[in-house]
Amino acid sequence: MKLTLEPAPRCLHEYVSQLLEDWQPECLSCEYSHGGSSPPSLHDLFDLELENSRSPSPLLCDWCAEADSESTISTETDVGFTLNTPPVSPLPSYSTSPASIPEDMLLCLEEMPTFDDGDEVRSATTSFEHWENNFDPNVGSFFGCLRCAYYQEQGENSICGLCYLKALAEGKIF
């Protein structure tokens, strides 16, 4: 395997200009030229104003111009066309009585136990049972859900996001 090394270009601008000339698509009739000290703006590069919208762009080759004219013809024929779709069928109604939903499913998730009986939070050393409305870290009362109580028992003064939002709504945190 033979490797050839090309010398590094002396001027990056000249190198890019040469690459653009070598790789210029055939259907573009414009040439890259760096005239003046300021490069053309994006508006100048991409804002094409055609005198007649039906005439193909002078920058496109014959094949591209034909494809462009076919797309304009197809959109003109679709103007008066309306699509008739069937109406959406209504959702089936399910008869559910309130008696079929157990009451424990309607409780707030923050008050439901989130840990098993063997977990550290529900061990005999904890005094946390439910949501507390008073938050005073110096007194040592727990604030929030069982997960918050676990970290508060470890000495951290933190609560989870849901408990923070609930305390904020109740005006306990300012």
UniProtKB/Swiss-Prot annotation:
Domain of life: Viruses
Keywords on record: Activator, Early protein, G1/S host cell cycle checkpoint dysregulation by virus, Host nucleus, Host-virus interaction, Inhibition of host innate immune response by virus, Inhibition of host interferon signaling pathway by virus, Inhibition of host STAT1 by virus, Interferon antiviral system evasion, Metal-binding, Modulation of host cell cycle by virus, Transcription, Transcription regulation, Viral immunoevasion, Zinc, Zinc-finger
GO biological process: regulation of DNA-templated transcription; symbiont-mediated perturbation of host cell cycle G1/S transition checkpoint; symbiont-mediated suppression of host innate immune response; symbiont-mediated suppression of host JAK-STAT cascade via inhibition of STAT1 activity; symbiont-mediated suppression of host type I interferon-mediated signaling pathway
UniProt keyword annotation of Metal-binding present: yes
Subcellular location: Host nucleus
Region Interaction with RB1 in competition with E2F1, residue ranges: 40-48
GO CC annotation: host cell nucleus
Task performed by this protein: Plays a role in viral genome replication by driving entry of quiescent cells into the cell cycle. Stimulation of progression from G1 to S phase allows the virus to efficiently use the cellular DNA replicating machinery to achieve viral genome replication. E1A protein has both transforming and trans-activating activities. Induces the disassembly of the E2F1 transcription factor from RB1 by direct competition for the same binding site on RB1, with subsequent transcriptional activation of E2F1-regulated S-phase genes and of the E2 region of the adenoviral genome.
Protein family per UniProt: Belongs to the adenoviridae E1A protein family.
Subunit annotation: Interacts with host UBE2I; this interaction interferes with polySUMOylation. Interacts with host RB1; this interaction induces the aberrant dissociation of RB1-E2F1 complex thereby disrupting the activity of RB1 and activating E2F1-regulated genes. Interacts with host ATF7; the interaction enhances ATF7-mediated viral transactivation activity which requires the zinc binding domains of both proteins.
Name under which the protein is recorded: Early E1A protein
Organism: Canine adenovirus serotype 1 (strain RI261) (CAdV-1)
Lineage: Viruses, Varidnaviria, Bamfordvirae, Preplasmiviricota, Tectiliviricetes
